[in-house]
Amino acid sequence: MIYAAPGTPGAVVTFKPRYGNYIGGEFVPPVKGQYFTNTSPVNGQPIAEFPRSTAEDIDKALDAAHAAADAWGRTSVQERSNILLKIADRIEQNLELLAVTETWDNGKAVRETLNADIPLAADHFRYFAGCIRAQEGSAAEINDSTVAYHIHEPLGVVGQIIPWNFPLLMAAWKLAPALAAGNCVVLKPAEQTPLGICVLLELIGDLLPPGVLNVVQGFGREAGEALATSKRIAKIAFTGSTPVGSHILKCAAESIIPSTVELGGKSPNIYFEDIMQAEPAFIEKAAEGLVLAFFNQGEVCTCPSRALVQESIYPAFMEEVLKKVRAIKRGDPLDTETMVGAQASQQQYEKILSYLDIAQQEGAELLAGGSVEKLEGNLASGYYIQPTLLKGHNGMRVFQEEIFGPVVGVTTFKDEAEALAIANDTEYGLGAGLWTRDINRAYRMGRGIKAGRVWTNCYHLYPAHAAFGGYKKSGVGRETHKMMLDHYQQTKNLLVSYDIDPLGFF
């Protein structure tokens, strides 16, 4: 099935020519009246105009959030939970509309938005609706007349900055725990993908009290900087590049507020020789696990962009992988058969191509792809790159630097010790993949790899209730787990004496 382009006959969605900031429960124009035009990666054509917001717009959103904070924080857990469940239902009821919107905004294949991004977004709201209902404080008996009560309280007003690679899903990852915990939010989307959150707000805005959720569009150096440096937020959460994340952490330190940052990665995907003695279905699964590096066009922080294959199985296993690569269907992202879509922006498109040049200069062997994906018709102006496999070594820049595109560096190893050394030879530690039928090896390697998540005999699963976050320069904090509620709460200790007698010091 091929979905009609938005705004054309038969389309499931039509966009407005101009959107505002969402502040205090309504869309409003930017204070200075400035806008920027966003284009679709699918065809390089304009989508709509969005506010080029400034510090004044951030302050306006913070005014609305602070005005709503006390009432929302006092809203019962049951009511907050029910609102999150209604948000999940509304998302699910508008699956196709949101999936097509996300594809048009980001360029990713609609098969992914239909089956991953949007369903997972709904599920995360449901998950945290359940978590907040189940969360308990504690009471500790200090002695026979003194009790320590520990109570969860919301932080108040928090800032969130989301990336362009999974705009709606990353919004759900951050909004669900923050709202569940009783916080009001000022959120800034990436300027490359401002559309999806606007369409979502049109669908769910009536479910939340005005001021609880506010969205300010604009550029990172203007609106994002103003939000991150504001003295009126109690926490900042960010997903994006490591250099920007480092700056966010400095801003948080200056304001003495907590921060959660999910940053870059250069994830190893390790294949041991015993997989080739497994069932044919498992061998195919393992090959797919390597090709999953092209999921979302490689624009994933945990992209398994370093494939480590044991020497003894390299020829046979890579033939299975190349069969999968040759079978990848490229083309119109609105076609449900398309597996790899467009890169999210021209800037990212050019960055990836520059790394393909670097790989050639470094002497990497080209196994597949390596160039622009030339499409015809309306897609000719889109940002398409061939899924690319490069054979090389871990010292190359294409193995060490985050490319954030459909580019995988493949290398070999002799034994377990060498595999672990190569895997950990990176400044990042967000994710890793591990493929073996030896359960003891799986445990040893899983514990030895310095990464926040180690997929074992699988890859790119992102269920709620599986903690997600990085080691080293891949970030601070964890998401997609009930522990995230603690990140959006303060702990109040009530230390109560039930003894009528004085202490006796004075």
Curated annotation (Swiss-Prot):
This chain belongs to which protein, by name?
Answer: Acetaldehyde dehydrogenase
Q: Describe its function.
A: Catalyzes the NAD(+)-dependent oxidation of acetaldehyde to acetate. Is likely a component of the ethanol oxidation system that allows P.aeruginosa to grow on ethanol as the sole carbon and energy source.
Question: InterPro entries from the xrefs?
Answer: Ald_DH/histidinol_DH, Ald_DH_C, Ald_DH_CS_CYS, Ald_DH_CS_GLU, Ald_DH_N, Aldehyde_DH_dom
The pathway it acts in is:
Alcohol metabolism; ethanol degradation; acetate from ethanol: step 2/2
What does the UniProt induction comment state? Induced by growth on ethanol.
User: What is the enzyme's class at the highest EC level?
Assistant: oxidoreductase
Which protein family is named in the record?
Belongs to the aldehyde dehydrogenase family.
Pfam families, from UniProt? Aldedh
Report any one BP term from Gene Ontology: ethanol catabolic process
Keyword NAD, does the record have it? yes
